[in-house]
Amino acid sequence: MKNHLSNVLCAMRSDFKDNHQETINKMIQFGTVKYGIVKQLKDRARSADKDIGSDQEENGGCSPLTTATTTASPSRSPEPEEEQPEEQSTSEQSIPEQSTPDHQLENDIKSEAKSEIEPVEDNNNRVAMTKPSSEEREPNASGSMPSSPVAEASAEEAATERTPEKEKEKDVEVDVEKPDEAPSSAVPSTEVTLPGGAGAPVTLEAIQNMQMAIAQFAAKTIANGSNGADNEAAMKQLAFLQQTLFNLQQQQLFQIQLIQQLQSQLALNQAKQEEDTEEDADQEQDQEQETDTYEEEERIADMELRQKAEARMAEAKARQHLINAGVPLRESSGSPAESLKRRREHDHESQPNRRPSLDNTHKADTAQDALAKLKEMENTPLPFGSDLASSIITNHDDLPEPNSLDLLQKRAQEVLDSASQGILANSMADDFAFGEKSGEGKGRNEPFFKHRCRYCGKVFGSDSALQIHIRSHTGERPFKCNVCGSRFTTKGNLKVHFQRHAQKFPHVPMNATPIPEHMDKFHPPLLDQMSPTDSSPNHSPAPPPLGSAPASFPPAFPGLQNLYRPPMEILKSLGAAAPHQYFPQELPTDLRKPSPQLDEDEPQVKNEPVEEKDQREEHEQEMAECSEPEPEPLPLEVRIKEERVEEQEQVKQEDHRIEPRRTPSPSSEHRSPHHHRHSHMGYPPVVQPIQPAALMHPQSSPGSQSHLDHLPTPGQLPPREDFFAERFPLNFTTAKMLSPEHHSPVRSPAGGALPPGVPPPPHHHPHHMARSPFFNPIKHEMAALLPRPHSNDNSWENFIEVSNTCETMKLKELMKNKKISDPNQCVVCDRVLSCKSALQMHYRTHTGERPFKCRICGRAFTTKGNLKTHMAVHKIRPPMRNFHQCPVCHKKYSNALVLQQHIRLHTGEPTDLTPEQIQAAEIRDPPPSMMPGHFMNPFAAAAFHFGALPGGPGGPPGPNHGAHNGALGSESSQGDMDDNMDCGEDYDDDVSSEHLSNSNLEQEGDRSRSGDDFKSLLFEQKLRIDATGVVNTNPVRPRSSASSHGHSVGSTSAPTSPSVHASSQVIKRSSSPARSEASQGALDLTPRAAPTSSSSSRSPLPKEKPVSPPSLPRSPSGSSHASANILTSPLPPTVGIDCLPPGLQHHLQQQHQHLMQQQAAVAAAAAAQHHHHQQMAALHQHQEQLRREAAEAQQKAAAAAAAAAAAAAAQRQTPPQARDQRQEGGPGAGPPPNPLMGARPPFGMFPNLPLFPPATTQNMCNAMNQIAQSVMPAAPFNPLALSGVRGSTTCGICYKTFPCHSALEIHYRSHTKERPFKCSICDRGFTTKGNLKQHMLTHKIRDMEQETFRNRAVKYMSEWNEDRE
């Protein structure tokens, strides 16, 4: 097979010269000589003649070329000529690859080159070829190298110069020995200069001892001169040599594989052309070829190993010389320039047969100097601009010492250099691998290589994926967490990481902009800004002395003033022992890996991070050591459940100091001593308005502590007192006190009021601060805690309450002995559910339990998903850019069409929207009770003409009068809409209604609800109905003696004009936000301020002399009890209840029954009614004027008839006790005749709208309910007032967008509380038909199959009793 391949190559030699000369020249220029020739041979071999013998005879001169060798001996070879045969024989023994087909192919190429060059021989058989003079004038240019990198990369196995003299000499001498003079040679090589080429010499030889050749060249180059431009050029050339050596080794393997493929293809083609008689011989040749292929692969592997071993030996010898020698580098005598010049002249004049001894000595000295200088060059930075020399891989030094920064950085740089070194190698491999496609216009520009990594060769589908992958090589992490400072390679990883901070720091947005590492000092993480010192924020300060009070903590957010300004920061004027100025939950968890403390002399570098597990264990140990004796100034989490401490030990500790708690409670250091006292006792912290002295000793109910142990765990809420007392310090205080000396912080134990205008002394409120006039605590509280719209924040779970009581208590007895075939089968209806959780939720349809309760509005739900959907209505509403104000009552609306409907309520005209819908669209102001004494905004001052708040009308105003009596309302957000739209009318909220009703069974003084204190604060402002049937919004809690000057029980229904009412009323403060009956139990957040001289002047009508109410007694013993009796007036069971929509009637009836049980003094209620009727008499004149302007004749007649019937019904239904009380009040105490009764609009079921008198008859309520029901179907809800046009699918109230109009209509029912689908059995209402169908399933079990269920229950109970016996 070898002879066959040689004959084929020889036969094609003459054809190449004539037909392919131009192709060979181009291939040599582009460095693809061998590949181009092999490709041409591959094409030509398919049409080769079978007669090989005749071709050998015709081209007989070619056959000697296959065995003869031409040795190109440089003129300045350090070895003498007589030693060359020995060296060649040694090389022939060590490298068997020279007899391979690759070697034969190479010889043919050399013979072709010789015949094409046609040199002129001299007597010594040498051919002298001189380079152009232009190259000689530019020795430092990159083009002055003897061969370009591309040409060298495309040469055979060793396209490099043989001796160092070739780099410096411009005259190249080629020794061409005739075939008969050199019978055998193991290292064939030749240097040719093509006539049509660029004049660059091309070396074609096999790689042999390349490492030693490069070492000799380096030694010669460095020995010529250590400085100057020549040395720099030599360094560049040396870099090229080492870079090319690596590329050629890779290229050699690839070319050998191509030759093997060519041989196999030639064998296959030859086998097809042979006759059938020669098939056996062909098969033997094929087997021999396969054997030769395997042998070739083994030889290739041996050659690689041998080359690597030689390289390692050379490196080891160089290191050994450097270690053992220790001699400074030998400098030549004279300047470097003179030495270089003299050496060049000596090289030109010297003969090739110089003495061996001198050459050997020179070789040894220069090699040792070159190795020493190479070692020195590795450890010193290269000159600027020597980019080629800097790319040399110098990963050959000893192993680095442990923890050595210099060696670590050097090793990293070498890795990067090695990675960049592979770029050229991969590029050349691509050229060869896809060389066939280059002719078709494709090659490396095709999409497959467009996003290919040059480090590892992976291919990606997009440029962005490639850039992200490259970061794995470079170690770049551009995305930085702005909270803890951690870095990430992708934005997605940062987003996932940032969710860990979202719950602790919800107001900080994620910074998705890439930040380079050198810009870290301009972008410090948030935790570093929050740290009081440069050390880690995990460590607590030193513990204070045992008897000293806790010192005030320094501000923890020094650089965060502009990012987030907490509402409590502006309340530091009193300078008392203030708690931490930020909310406890605002401190995020420190997720950073703390860097170890470095010495000052040690360079500040980025060390490898410590293992997270070890660091966390050390941190836990430190915290365990520090937690017992030290207080925690910066707690990281919030706890509700508190440990109980023995009473004696607690009282003893409270007398001396505040004991820091072992549990990481965030507010343990910030609470007042009063809170510590009752919290140590195990009582739940309760927020409550200020109580008079007589009621500060409540009796604890047995179930008052039953819910704190079952609070939700997802987001732990702070304790109630700490949750509100720190945020609303002037409005709330504790109700659970142990002794009379721990009464309200703002009032003395004797009950005496502080002088008006004098702030309470600091010892009365140890942790209370002054309040800014523009501070809205509800808005700031809810805005800081509720999640923002379209966010993934889970802080809404702070406002849910989960009842962990057993949901299947009613079914446990039946399930004990029931034999159920399926584990997920319902024991009641035998329905099989998909899983255990679905079965548990299914049981709630039988038991009616709703364990998930909203703490803001009190609604309960069967599943957590429904509660989460409900929490969306409490989220913050986008800010209103403008609003439309009513000229009469100064209410504000975002939609002008809704304002138009609202004005029709004033004029008595029929409206397209119900008052509920109009009320829902109103823009609320913060409640006046949450504001300080004399501050009212302009709208609030005008709106206080309304008089809708029936709080006490009399008494001189004081700075602390109204500021301490407010209850918590809804935040200025979507919660306004939710609370103003029938929080109580909840058809699917049985559990919530029953719980509220049962909570009212407690005594009036006992206001400490167990787990529902937050909810009870809201719902104690629920609708109260007085004896006249008017919805009363007075809180049931009695107020203190300073604020209990008198009460108007039914003042919301009396006035018909805000102007006259404002002029006729005395200056007063509201005790709670008004609950309009249109909202049916929700807080009316519209401010009702007392008119001042400026605000009351807005009224176009003349003022009237205000009626001064009688002053009530001020003693703490009598007034408190009297005020409690006044506020708990009796409620007739049938009067006024039907005036409300039917959804709230059941709840109000139960509430009325509890109020009747709590009634203690009927005379006080009669006195309040007497005062109410006096106000009605004062407003009678303006009512007559309004009736003449607004009423029409037809409405007068219709309403007059209804008024007559209503008066008769009221006379019959009024309780005799209340009637006697009216008579006892005197002749002037009775209500005067109301001529405006006939001018009422057809919505009389909303009596607390301040414009109309109360509806006091059952017939009147029924008539108006019928009118409302007849109007509602004809006028569907259309907030945009677009007749016949389907408007946008965006909600006009909360600005949510829905996919269709029907979904929007269903959504509007959540605002309007409209439930059009009624159950025919229990009369419950539902918003959708699907909910009604689901509800009907419960009746199918409970009612329609009641007999079956009863029999089954009896059977189960009998079986259970038998088993029990």
Curated annotation (Swiss-Prot):
A zinc finger (C2H2-type) spans 451-473, 479-501, 824-846, 852-874, 884-906, 1289-1311, 1317-1339. The gene is salm. The modification Phosphoserine is found at S739, S744, S1076, S1079. PROSITE patterns: ZINC_FINGER_C2H2_1, ZINC_FINGER_C2H2_2. GO terms for cellular component: nucleus. Residues 103-117, 159-181, 346-363, 603-622, 638-662, 1181-1191 have a biased composition (Basic and acidic residues). It is found in: Nucleus. GO terms for molecular function: DNA binding; DNA-binding transcription factor activity, RNA polymerase II-specific; zinc ion binding. Residues 530-539, 1055-1079 have a biased composition (Polar residues). Coiled coil: none annotated. Required for the establishment of the posterior-most head and the anterior-most tail segments of the embryo. Probably function as a transcriptional regulator. Could repress the transcription of the tsh gene. Its main location: nucleus. It comes from Drosophila melanogaster. Belongs to the sal C2H2-type zinc-finger protein family. This is Homeotic protein spalt-major. Transmembrane segments: none annotated. Residues 63-76, 87-99, 146-157, 1040-1054, 1085-1100, 1114-1123, 1146-1168, 1192-1218 have a biased composition (Low complexity). Residues 47-194, 270-298, 322-363, 508-554, 586-716, 740-772, 948-1012, 1030-1129, 1146-1241 are annotated as: Disordered. Residues 540-554 have a biased composition (Pro residues). PANTHER family: HOMEOTIC PROTEIN SPALT-MAJOR, SAL-LIKE PROTEIN.
